[in-house]
Amino acid sequence: MKLIKNRVQILRERLNYLEYLYYVKSESKVSDEEYDILLEELRQLEFKYPYLITKSSSTQSISNVCDNSLNRIRHQKPMLSLNSIRDKSQLLLFDKRIKYKLSNHYNINQNLIVYCCELKIDGVALSILYKQGKLVHAATRGDGKIGENVTKNVNAIDSIPKNLKKNNNEILPDLLEIRGEIFISKLSFSKLNQEMLSSGKKVFSNARNAASGSLRQLDPHVTELRSLVFCCYGISYYAGLKQLPNSHWGRLKLCNRWGLSINNYIQIVSGIDPVLEYYNYVRKIRSELEYQIDGIVIKIDNCIYQDQLGCGFRAPNWAVAYKFPAELKLTKLNDVVFKVGRTGLITPIAYINPVVIGNVIIKKVNMHNVNEVKRLNLMIGDTVIVQRSGDVIPKILKIILENRVDNAKFIKIPEFCPSCGSILKVEDNKSSVLRCLAKLTCLAQRKSALKHFASRKAMNIQGMGSRVINQLVDKGLICTPVDFFSLSKEKLLCLDRYGEKSAERLLQSILIAKEITLSAFIYALGIPGVGESVSNKLAYMYRTIENLMNADLQSFLQLKFIGKIAAMNIYSFLHQSDNYNNIQGLIRSNLIFK
């Protein structure tokens, strides 16, 4: 029984972490399929052992995934997710359940349930509240009950009306809560990444992440320049004298008349067979669309039936997302390079002949660990099948062994760090996790740690990007984070293409960065296993950096939001002499904790 409890806890922590990355950080670490498998495993365990169910479980609610840098807004009605299906049999089962549940209350035609079929646009869900036709506020999904306030940014998006249109003496609802999707077109996404690349900034991995990151900008002017588009997909709440149609499609047409954009590919069908025809049709035209989609959404059109079927903890019972299978492409493996990460983790990166999957050019694939190279029996020159899982994460599925060339080269697993030459340690024999233990004496780790420290979510030193940090380290001008605060104009003028104005701007950014929240400072330290969420909680628990540094191991082990390994990592990191001296040096740099 203890093993079952441990597995449930591991699944919950993993799902919460993935939801936080997806909704707040705009990052996708696993494919949709992998996420769904984890969620389904947790659902099955909780079904078998119902006494293990908790309110915070991912099966019962959407995790608390709000960005702390944004204010929060409570939705009028919970903003739920959608259950996903991936094959015809699951669609038929969905239709069968709908008919069974409705037949208990209504005399329905068993063969002619009316469905509204829509494209599943790959973007960010948005809730907008109008009061007497005027936009009051807008919020992201958040945890489903409370979302992030993005009103200022939404006001900068042209496709969202600030005031609803009305014809002659038409009555508008006193309150109207609209739900829809914020997304970016393929063309705008390509242009945005070109601009990011030319300015030396990190590009977005996919259009969904670009839309999410653009919507959450602290500067609305940046959002305005990102060419975001809004598409309304429903009304979640209304109040007042205005009566709305009992048809979902009828309500969408009404929204369109009021000035809200709706999708051009919506179809109303009777029965489940036309739903399959719509699915197959959309798959054929998918590549021709101006924006990314990852499936279709099927909803019961009758709003009375919707109310009768109700909602689960995570998703409505009257709708489902029918996802497309991942796209596959054949290509050639040209090289495997072993990269040293910020914490010393050695990651194999596979470089391939470029292939286009889902309108994204794939040139390299993260292999995660050495075991993947061994499992796939990879050799340089092999023909490989690449999958863009969930249309997000590139992955090498397998090799075509019969296509292996005579001059294919064996991939040598490193014994020494590619950066500093230190002997690598095997941390996990099962997955062959390799790590360099040289820490900041390793040049690659030092650069990565300094980049992390200066990044936007950490110290947020504007202008201190990868190119600048690489030069500062290579020229011996900085070695530890403390060195950022002893930089002078004279030192900065040693950098390539750096003039007086650039140096003065960067020094001003360093000065501004000294005023920081405790949570951002903890995150900036780069403690293994401590991301933004844990940093926020540690800051809340300990209040000051002195309290955190003086805490004993038992104090960390008692924290409910981290496990034993994370607790030991935090304690060890804070009490390692170099780290301790580094933190003390940073405190002496006159940081102001706000």
Swiss-Prot record:
CDD domains: LIGANc (cd00114). One of its GO terms (biological process) is DNA replication. NAD(+) binds at residues 32-36, 81-82, 118, 141, 181, 299, 323. It holds the Pfam family DNA_ligase_OB. Zn(2+) binds at residues 417, 420, 436, 442. Its EC number is 6.5.1.2. Its cofactor is Mg(2+); Mn(2+). The active site is at residue 120. Keywords: DNA damage, DNA repair, DNA replication, Ligase, Magnesium, Manganese, Metal-binding, NAD, Zinc. The keyword RNA-binding does not apply. SMART domains: LIGANc (SM00532). GO terms for cellular component: cytosol. Transmembrane segments: none annotated. GO terms for molecular function: DNA ligase (NAD+) activity; metal ion binding. It catalyses: NAD(+) + (deoxyribonucleotide)n-3'-hydroxyl + 5'-phospho-(deoxyribonucleotide)m = (deoxyribonucleotide)n+m + AMP + beta-nicotinamide D-nucleotide. Gene3D superfamilies: 5' to 3' exonuclease, C-terminal subdomain, DNA ligase/mRNA capping enzyme, Helix hairpin bin, Nucleic acid-binding proteins. Belongs to the NAD-dependent DNA ligase family. LigA subfamily. HAMAP family: DNA_ligase_A. DNA ligase that catalyzes the formation of phosphodiester linkages between 5'-phosphoryl and 3'-hydroxyl groups in double-stranded DNA using NAD as a coenzyme and as the energy source for the reaction. It is essential for DNA replication and repair of damaged DNA. This is DNA ligase. It comes from Blochmanniella floridana. The gene is ligA.
